[in-house]
Regions:
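Short N-terminal strand-loop motif that marks the start
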Residues: 1-69, 131, 352-354
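C-terminal hydrophobic helical "lid"/dimerization subdomain
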Residues: 1-7, 262, 304-354
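Glycine-rich beta-strand-centered segment in the early N-terminal region that forms part
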Residues: 27-41, 54-103, 140-142
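NAD(P)H dinucleotide-binding glycine-rich loop of Rossmann-like/cofactor-binding domains
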Residues: 37, 94-178
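Mid-domain Rossmann-like dinucleotide-binding core that forms the NAD(H)/NADP(H) cofactor-binding site
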Residues: 141-225, 229
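Glycine-rich phosphate-binding loop and adjacent beta-alpha segment
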Residues: 194, 203, 250-321, 352-354
Length: 354
């Protein structure tokens, strides 16, 4: 199929504006890039936040979208390890590839990073996109485009958080706050896969039902009262070994920290910036409590390339299930964003391109 000159895309014309459909040129390849024909792209809070928080997007207009499944249709002149026809997803941090952090599996801390796919460069809300070849990860046969599209963030992110930060092991009691969202619902599955006993907290009936279906052992309706008190009751006063907070509001962070058992780990993985959601994320930590109970507080920032590949393999084996509750055509992106802003989506949404 010959390369077209133009493509359909959803663009963010300026800061704070709604997305709008547009016909734009197909992006040009750099020598180390690949051109993807986009098959599906995930819709998550990261994309919604970039439209409302100043400084995330480097220039306008911008094509959003950082979760992608696509087919390689063209290679840059220096690309050798990827083939035309490969199905791939991508690591969405743009990095130098040579600094201490990039070479030690901590790409997300690269000091030379210009930003993220869909913010510092155009993303996957389009029929075609370019991406540095070093960012792509092969999609195994048997994993659908929609599942693969969300895997690189919504599933891989909690894989890293549960394994490396929370260090969930057999018998651990694990609290997951914001468990019914696009990342939290997969954290429930990851914690169960690691042998944890999962207490899943959220604020709507449909999300609590969904996390039960995803394997949660105990449900906590945060509307019914103090989070830490509910955890204490469910654990007979023991507390949890790990708390993973995908909301990161003042209330949930205080509740998560207050829910920890001795030697417990609090993992902060999500955020809902005030500019986008009106959420206050500041909270006070008493160092005497942290010291006396030997607590740990971790920030968990995305994943490595290897962890994306491992997550895709878990999907291929059927050990993890991708939870995509709604799919939309490309032009339905703004509708999907509005559902996210209203906290009305269970699990993830995806845009599917024909």
């Amino acid at each position: 199929m010959p390369r077209p000159d133009t493509m359909r895309a959803m663009i963010l014309p300026e800061f704070g504006a709604p997305l709008r459909p547009a016909t734009v040129p197909v992006p040009k390849l750099g020598p180390n890039d690949v051109l993807l024909r986009v098959r599906a792209t995930g819709v998550g809070l990261t994309v919604v936040i970039m439209t409302r928080v100043p400084g995330r997007v480097t220039s306008f207009p911008r094509i959003p979208g950082h979760e992608v499944a696509g087919e390689v249709v063209e290679l840059g002149s220096e690309v050798a390890h990827v083939k035309v026809g490969d199905r791939v997803t991508c690591h969405f941090y743009l990095t130098c590839g040579v600094c201490h952090f990039c070479r030690s599996g901590r790409e997300t801390l690269c000091p030379a990073s210009p930003g993220n796919v869909g913010m510092a460069c155009d993303g996957a809300y389009a029929e075609y996109m370019t991406i540095p070849a070093r960012n792509v990860v092969a999609i195994p046969a048997g994993v659908s485009d929609v599942d693969a599209a969300i895997a690189a963030d919504a599933i891989a992110t909690p894989y890293h958080a549960c394994r490396e930060e929370a260090r969930v092991g057999p018998g651990d009691l694990v609290l997951i706050v914001g468990a019914g969202g696009g990342v939290g619902i997969h954290a429930v599955q990851m914690a169960k896969l690691a042998g944890g006993w999962v207490l899943a907290a959220d604020i709507t009936d449909d999300k609590l039902a969904a996390v039960r279906d995803s394997g949660a052992d105990e449900l906590i309706d945060v509307r019914r009262g103090d989070l830490a008190a509910q955890v204490s009751k469910l654990t007979a006063g023991r507390g949890v070994d790990a708390a993973i907070d995908f909301v990161a509001s003042k209330e949930t962070l205080e509740g998560s920290l207050g829910s920890l058992a001795r030697a417990g780990r609090l993992v902060i993985i999500g955020s809902r910036p005030t500019a986008a959601f009106g959420v206050d994320s500041s909270f006070v930590v008493d160092p005497r409590h942290v010291l006396g109970s030997m607590l740990e507080i971790h920030g968990s920032r995305y994943v490595t390339l290897t962890e994306i590949a491992q997550t895709l393999e878990l999907l291929r084996q059927g050990r993890i299930r991708a939870v995509v509750s709604r799919t939309f055509p490309l032009e339905g992106a703004e509708e999907a964003h509005e559902l996210l802003r209203r906290n009305a989506l269970v699990g993830r949404a995806a845009l599917v391109l024909s």
